[in-house]
């Protein structure tokens, strides 16, 4: 393979050169390049807000670039829509999947281009062509199944198969493993490598460094809307990539934890929730100033614990004591009044109001407290508290009236956490808080957790990333099939021990 810096134009399948894009008051892209070869897997990396999404929207015609050129298979192009891009051989598998849940798998595969026999859809041909593609990609899904019955990983396979059916030459994958098990990730990687072997150029977007090194051949790094480098991945270290992404050296991935947890703040005994299957006889305690991790495989019911504590799920048996006093949270409002806060797993669907501004998203959990004596909202206090969230959480935004949906994932998450801090919680529960967030934003969230622990807050974090749990927590509660398999001291345990416990009740 030719060296990237001296490669000839014929070596490239896709060339995006000197791309500029500005919005009012913001230079989103400044002379950015992305060049992808056939038969390669190309990592596109950068912090949230670095310009990755804007660059790809320029490729797909969602945004019109201000200047620069896009050459695909030797021809300069300017797609008017993602549909046109797909028809020409450029496809994207989004983090938020784009499937019609109540239709069959094969309906989704051929939506808008059904094979016909006379005036009718040729169901037999549609089935056979779908099955042939699935067989070639080693996808074990019945084309006649409803999409709603499938797992997230199976839905992603359908999106990839759809790109395959269009004979896509460029396939862009945005955080494709964020909700997958290790087994599902390995299967996905097998399919990606098959696409590579057919001559596709894969653009792979992920914040998971281990995946990048395992899968990719080359890397392009963006920072603050500017192109930093495009080079072979071979020979680069994780620290070098992080340094280029954030513009500084991160000497450590996790902040130092020097404080010692204090007295017990929360006691949970024999907790069982109503919905089945769910948690059974869960017992643990949480200390002031402690960060308690919850680990477990997919289906272990980790989320059920925090949802039951927060009043989203109803408990059947068991006791919850706060400062030694029995409490029952029958609703989220009751939980908030008792000093609980929950940052949910699905940021876009249950965490933010995507089409509303930062101010609304910052204040919604505490909105009743902003009424003055006349029953009207106190706009001065609301503006002040929104600004506190922006400043304290270091949210990158033009202002408090900015639509939160336009922010990067990391900045959205900071707003959500800031929203809950305004309720002055004693117990902060975070469910996969760094999923889909870049390394710089992750470190800021870890710092925040550490600072809150120093202020005697009790913190519970659910995470599927083992290095994260081992790096930030004091103890780890391991769940297996709805039951507590063990509680371990983080400093005394290993990843293998946690995985052994997580498999105990399967």
From Swiss-Prot:
Subunit structure: The complex is composed of one ATP-binding protein (MglA), two transmembrane proteins (MglC) and a solute-binding protein (MglB).
Gene that specifies this protein: mglA
Keyword annotations from UniProtKB, A to Z: ATP-binding, Cell inner membrane, Cell membrane, Membrane, Nucleotide-binding, Repeat, Sugar transport, Translocase, Transport
Keyword Membrane: yes
Domain ABC transporter: 14-249, 264-506
Signal peptide: none
Gene Ontology CC annotations of this record: plasma membrane
NCBIfam families per the UniProt record, alphabetical: PRK10982.1
Matching Gene3D superfamilies: P-loop containing nucleotide triphosphate hydrolases (3.40.50.300)
Keyword hit for Transmembrane: no
Transmembrane segments: none
Catalysis performed (reactions): D-galactose(out) + ATP + H2O = D-galactose(in) + ADP + phosphate + H(+); methyl beta-D-galactoside(out) + ATP + H2O = methyl beta-D-galactoside(in) + ADP + phosphate + H(+)
Family as reported in the entry's similarity comment: Belongs to the ABC transporter superfamily. Galactose/methyl galactoside importer (TC 3.A.1.2.3) family.
Matches recorded under Pfam families: ABC_tran
Residue positions binding ATP: 46-53
Superkingdom of origin: Bacteria
Membrane topology field: Peripheral membrane protein
Primary role: Part of the ABC transporter complex MglABC involved in galactose/methyl galactoside import. Responsible for energy coupling to the transport system.
GO molecular function list: ATP binding; ATP hydrolysis activity
SMART domains: AAA (SM00382)
Protein's UniProt name: Galactose/methyl galactoside import ATP-binding protein MglA
């Amino acid at each position: 393979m030719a060296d990237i810096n001296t490669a000839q134009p014929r070596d490239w399948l896709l060339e995006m050169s000197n791309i500029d894009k500005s919005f009012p008051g913001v230079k989103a892209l400044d002379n950015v390049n992305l060049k992808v070869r056939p038969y390669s897997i190309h990592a596109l990396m950068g912090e949230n807000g670095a310009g990755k999404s804007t660059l790809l929207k320029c490729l797909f015609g969602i945004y019109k670039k201000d200047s620069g050129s896009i050459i695909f298979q030797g021809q300069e192009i300017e797609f008017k829509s993602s549909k046109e891009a797909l028809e020409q051989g450029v496809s994207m598998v989004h983090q938020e999947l784009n499937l019609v849940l109540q239709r069959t798998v094969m309906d989704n595969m051929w939506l808008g281009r059904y094979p016909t026999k006379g005036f009718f859809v040729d169901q037999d041909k549609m089935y056979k062509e779908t099955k042939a593609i699935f067989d070639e990609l080693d996808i074990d899904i019945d084309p006649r199944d409803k999409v709603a019955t499938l797992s997230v990983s199976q839905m992603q396979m359908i999106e990839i198969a759809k790109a395959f059916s269009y004979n896509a030459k460029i396939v862009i994958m945005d955080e494709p493993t964020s909700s997958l098990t290790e087994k599902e990730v390995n299967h996905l990687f097998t399919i990606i490598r098959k696409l590579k072997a057919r001559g596709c150029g894969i653009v792979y977007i992920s914040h998971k460094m281990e995946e990048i090194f395992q899968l990719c051949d080359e890397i392009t790094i963006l920072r603050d809307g500017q192109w930093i480098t495009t080079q072979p991945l071979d020979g680069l270290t994780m620290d070098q990539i992080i340094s280029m992404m954030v513009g500084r050296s991160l000497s450590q991935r996790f902040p130092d934890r020097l404080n010692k947890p204090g007295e017990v703040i929360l006691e949970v005994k024999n907790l069982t929730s109503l919905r089945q299957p769910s948690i059974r006889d869960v017992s643990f305690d949480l200390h002031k100033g402690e960060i308690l991790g919850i680990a477990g495989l997919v289906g272990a019911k980790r989320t059920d614990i925090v949802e039951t504590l927060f009043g989203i799920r109803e408990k059947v048996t068991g006791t919850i004591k706060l400062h030694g006093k029995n409490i029952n949270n029958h609703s989220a409002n009751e939980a908030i009044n008792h000093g609980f806060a929950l940052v949910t797993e699905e940021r876009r669907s249950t965490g933010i109001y995507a089409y509303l501004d930062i101010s609304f998203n910052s204040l919604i959990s505490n909105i009743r407290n902003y009424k003055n004596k006349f029953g009207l909202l106190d706009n001065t206090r609301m503006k002040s508290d929104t600004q506190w969230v922006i400043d304290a959480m270091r949210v990158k935004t033009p202002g408090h009236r900015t639509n939160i949906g336009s922010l990067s994932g990391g900045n959205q998450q900071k707003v959500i956490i800031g929203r809950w801090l305004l309720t002055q919680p004693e117990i902060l529960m975070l469910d996969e808080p760094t999923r889909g967030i870049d390394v710089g934003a992750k470190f800021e969230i870890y710092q925040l957790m550490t600072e809150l622990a120093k202020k005697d807050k009790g913190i519970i974090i659910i995470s599927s990333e083992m290095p994260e749990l081992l790096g930030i927590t004091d103890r780890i509660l391991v769940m297996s099939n709805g039951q507590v398999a063990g509680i371990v001291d983080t400093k005394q345990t290993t990843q293998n021990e946690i995985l052994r416990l997580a498999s105990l009740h399967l």
